[in-house]
Amino acid sequence: RAGLAPYTYFADAGAKMYSAQDSWLTALPGAQRTAAAFELMYRLGKEYEKPEFGIHGVEIDGVECPVVERVDMSKPFCRLLRFKRYSDNEDRLRDLKDDPTVLVVAPLSGHHATLLRDTVRTLLIDHKVYITDWTDARMVPAEQGPFRLDDYVAYVQDFIRHIGCDNLHVVSVCQPTVPVLAAVSLMAARGE
């Protein structure tokens, strides 16, 4: 990727030159298409930073409850994040402890789990929330080996066992539906 950096910067400059309103290049035939091609090259080559979840609190029954994000389990290809709600009110704390638990299994590829922050924020109102945070495959050392479907299923099973509660709901978003169904089916067949 570092070798592509000069081309990425060049593509960004080209897109701006062919689309800037005060540039004479915009008057040339095909300028819009050229700008679009440069923009595409730029977007394919640029580095996208992983945004933060940024959930520090959630309003429950009109009262703001602080939320702390923490890594609950870490594996080479994924981290299991927990969003823990806090309260100084004993009654509210008791209610929070009685809430059901949900594991959100985010897609492995295509985007970061942080795009589900609104889903997590909404679930936090009346659930204990965990979410999978998959590691970019480029960042996993090659000695960890490949990550196949059976590994994916095993990760989901490990996360479910780690959470280990009687009232657990699992929500898969798009692509992980098949591995999640396989994981819970295998666990159910074993009586887990």
Locate each region found by the language model.
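A conserved short beta-strand
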Residues: V171, R190-E192
